[in-house]
Amino acid sequence: MRLNTLGKTNIRATLLGLGGGGFSRLGTGQNKGEPNAERVVQAALDAGVNLIDTAEGYDTETAIGNVIQNVDRTKFTLSTKLTYKKDGRLKPPTEVRASLEASLRRLHTDHVDIYHIHGVKLDDYQAVVDHTLPVLQRMRAEGKLRFIGITEGFASDTEHRALQRAAQDGYWDVMMIGFNLLNFSARDRLFHITRAKGIGVLCMFAVRQALICPQNLQSFLQKKVDAGELDAQTLHAVPLLRELVERGECSSFTEAAYRFCAHEPGIDCVLSGTGSVEHLRQNLIDIQKPALPAEFLARFEPLFAGVTALSGQ
């Protein structure tokens, strides 16, 4: 699998990273249990995936830790996230420290490679910089984390307002950014900055419910059109993707979604969350295929040019 360097971190990450969140949360979100989650993590490592992402709020750190405690820590990159507020207030320094230390215990490790502040809202950004970030910087000096990241709440911040502000600063080594076939606004709003500043980019939301199958996409777009949130021309996306599949240039809508993100300049690693070993293996096959045909992109992308209100959720 292709390896990309995460910005200036010098971390060499596989094109596909295993995501411990999303709808499935390694299957625990579908009540498949922790043993199944552990099988998915092990299958990812066995397939050569070398970046694993989770968060204290996902309840998948323990399953991941149960697997990686038996793996050479230098063979993979471990990423987790801090929930920066509790009961509507910013966590004080003692609670920020306690959050990371609890994550380390669940993950059975003495450090994480990337520690993100999770889902930062624009209105909270300055307070996070003033009060939360210094705690992470101190813990980095203690060796508990190597790099500091920030993620956006893409489901509600589809215009990347928080990360557009954060990208101007020099604080962040890695960013987790929402990007997919329905909303590729990060291309113009963020990637030129992250590339210039050497900020590593993890892609989330490559595939969400809307992009799983033709029926989901048709229903998703129709509801947005009926509500006046989208132009009716966006409905042409479904037949265009169907045509791509029927011509044998793509096996599924999901494959198209992964390939779209995999070949986007500015994206270093695409996160894939699943609770199925079989789905994981298929995603690994799909993401390593060539870029989508230029002729298809020339017809598809204008449908969503300027669209910033969708996450695909």
Task: Label the predicted regions.
Residues 45, 171, 189-313:
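Structured C-terminal cap/extension of enzyme domains
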Residues 61, 65-81, 133-144:
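Alpha-helix-loop-beta-strand connector modules within alpha/beta enzyme cores
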Residues 1-76:
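N-terminal binding-site loop/beta-alpha segment at the start of enzyme catalytic domains
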Residues 6, 18, 44, 52, ...:
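Conserved, mostly hydrophobic/aromatic
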Residues 11-16, 47-51, 72-76, 109-113, ...:
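Short, well-ordered coil/turn segments that N-cap beta-strands
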Residues 20-34, 150-155, 236-247:
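Glycine-rich phosphate-binding "P-loop"
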Residues 26-28, 32, 42, 89-181, ...:
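Glycine/proline-rich, positively charged
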Residues 74-87, 117-118, 177:
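A short, structured active-site edge motif that brings together acidic residues
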